[in-house]
């Protein structure tokens, strides 16, 4: 209802500000941290539409898949922010206390999101995630450097390595995300197919059909 419309309006407003932000970046009139925060805010408003949509879903399989996808996308977004913040610190050759805390927050925030996804996702998507999407040893080593000490000056070599490793992980996460989207669409199409006879009968029968119990899931 009105809450969903408000979420959509906020997201549209944030999207409308992207050209001005890109122009500032092109003219180097905005700090990297501020630009990253603005991009993250746009994505956050887009993602926040999902909980409002979920409030209108009465079918448990569809609701579960929606929450699994939403949780996964939240985790994936935090991985993207981790990539950006780490690349910034390694490029500069130092991590300020503020930048380091932001990085730690993004790393710590990923696990609850992915735990929620694994509790609700299909066995196939969960297995794919566990097989290829965890941060590998190379990423963990660079995380320790970023979070505990200052990196050595190497002309940006570590920054490129960090960015490449995180990009590879994001591509693997995208593969799982696409499967989650397919799962949600399949469940939705199945629900529509099952409900079609009921819609036709409803034109001749004014009785109220019992509604499915809604599973309340934290987002």
Task: Describe every region a protein language model picked out.
Residues 1-219:
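Hydrophobic alpha-helical segments
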